Swiss-Prot record:
Entries under Pfam families matching the protein: SDF (PF00375)
Functional summary from the UniProt entry: Responsible for the transport of dicarboxylates such as succinate, fumarate, and malate from the periplasm across the membrane.
PROSITE patterns linked: NA_DICARBOXYL_SYMP_1, NA_DICARBOXYL_SYMP_2
Major location (coarse): membrane
One of the GO BP terms on file: L-aspartate transmembrane transport
Alphabetized UniProt keyword annotations: Cell inner membrane, Cell membrane, Membrane, Symport, Transmembrane, Transmembrane helix, Transport
Keyword Cell inner membrane on entry: yes
One GO MF term: succinate transmembrane transporter activity
Domain of life: Bacteria
Official protein name in the record: C4-dicarboxylate transport protein
Length: 430
């Protein structure tokens, strides 16, 4: 097959668009800020199909399972993995901030901070208890879940729908076949929308640089650098070790999903690449049922980048305001962050709202301290989203391996960038 010219390759187009967006934002900020609708429009186009794709993928995956106990088993293994890896991410963020101390030297008086700028984030985060979170998973109506784009609500509906179809067997085959066909149509729509990724990335990046300016980064470069460095270490060391133990290279895996990562980089939203990621994981040998359960769940329960950010941001504010936290308070912070991070989604700004929820229950640190990082949060959200999507991709491969439903032949071919996939060779374990 003839190789595409480099300028027609999607990730090359996205890189070029991001560079042009940065240049426009720096030299013509007034024009660049008007480009925001391009980024917002692209994300809306992707979000338009996320709910239906998750529903169809999960339903067909579960309907094809002969053993319904498998649904609970896969879900249980996924949640166990999420909790273990999330704990590593929280601890790494804590350790890196203690080691590199990015907030030391600011000497900010908490009394001088104006909390009005972060009041809206605090209001959104206030009062979100565990019971509220669990009750929110149950939609008011099926239509409302899709209309609002609530991933966990759609996942609940899909689990029930798929379970009933599996129970019906041949009697439900017509419905199952219809949903399977609808899945193909939806992914076809995604392929069309993805071609617009360079335009979306250009608009989002131009707006970000145009509004905040490169100069706004300088005073807080140490925090940004610490966060990016810690996230890279997490991906290469923690996720790298998990990947190696499972039998694949984290570097090759990251290279395999580079187009999705560049879309995330341009839009700062890991949801923007969710449909493409699910399709890529299936092509890499993960079973549809595992992909359908693990990826959507991971977008609420496996946000590694957000976890690193949470502990790092809280400790940074404490260091900047010269507030000493005891080890008991830091352990409390870990426990609280473990819960509040589960309410975050893959949308820009969700990490900042989650931070407000964490600070609200750690009264030692003033909530108004969030203004210190409000201006740079947009620049950190890219790294959060990138780490989140890599973490969810690795989690899906690992759970597929645990379930003995990972086609290692397909995985090897995909990560090598090979063409034809050899006959199925299902894994015999991790």
């Amino acid at each position: 097959m003839k190789k595409k010219p480099f300028y027609k390759v999607l990730y090359v187009q996205v890189i070029f668009a991001i560079i042009v967006g940065v240049i426009l934002g720096h030299f013509y900020p007034s024009i660049a800020t008007d480009m925001k609708p391009l980024g917002d429009g692209f994300i809306k186009l992707i979000k338009m199909v996320i709910g239906p794709i998750i529903f169809c993928t999960v339903v067909t995956g579960i309907a094809g399972m002969e053993d319904m106990k498998k649904v609970g088993r896969v879900g249980g293994k996924a949640l166990l993995y999420f909790e273990i890896v999330s704990t590593f991410a929280l601890l790494l963020g804590l350790a890196a901030t203690h080691l590199l101390r990015p907030g030391v030297g600011f000497n900010i008086d908490p009394a001088t901070l104006d909390g009005k700028a972060v009041a809206s984030y605090a209001a959104k985060a206030h009062g979100q208890s565990t019971v509220d979170f669990l009750m929110h998973i149950i939609p008011n109506t099926m239509v409302d879940a899709f209309a609002q784009g609530e991933i966990l609500q759609i996942l609940l509906i899909a689990l029930l729908f798929g379970s009933v179809l599996a129970h019906l067997g041949e009697r439900g085959k017509v419905v199952t076949d219809f949903i399977d066909g609808l899945t193909r149509v939806l992914f076809g729509i995604v392929h069309i929308v993805t071609k617009l990724a360079p335009i979306g990335a250009f608009g989002a990046m131009a707006f970000t640089i145009g509004k905040y300016g490169v100069g706004s980064l300088v005073p807080l470069l140490k925090l940004i650098g610490t966060f990016y460095l810690t996230s890279v270490v997490f991906v290469l060391v923690v996720l790298g070790a998990i990947a190696r133990f499972t039998g694949f290279s984290i570097i090759r895996f990251v290279s395999y999903i580079k187009e999705e990562l560049l879309i995330v980089l341009g839009t700062s939203s890991s949801e923007a690449a969710l449909p493409q990621l699910m399709e890529k994981l299936e092509k890499a040998g993960c079973s549809r049922s595992v992909v359908g359960l693990v990826v959507p769940t991971g977008y609420s329960f496996n946000l590694d980048g957000t976890n690193i950010y949470m502990t790092m941001a809280v400790l940074f504010i404490a260091q900047a305001t010269n507030i000493e936290l005891t080890w008991m308070q830091q352990l409390t912070l870990l426990a609280v962050a473990m819960l509040t991070s589960k309410g975050a989604s893959g949308v820009t700004g969700a990490g900042f709202i989650t931070l407000a929820a964490t600070l609200a229950v750690v009264p030692t640190i003033p909530l108004s301290g969030m203004v210190l990082i409000l201006g740079i949060d947009r620049f950190m959200s890219e790294c959060r989203a990138l780490t989140n999507i890599v973490g969810n991709g690795v989690a899906t491969v690992v759970v597929s391996a645990w379930e003995k439903e990972l086609d290692r032949n397909k995985l090897r071919q995909a990560l090598k960038g090979g063409g034809e996939v050899a006959p199925t060779e299902t894994t015999a374990g991790v």
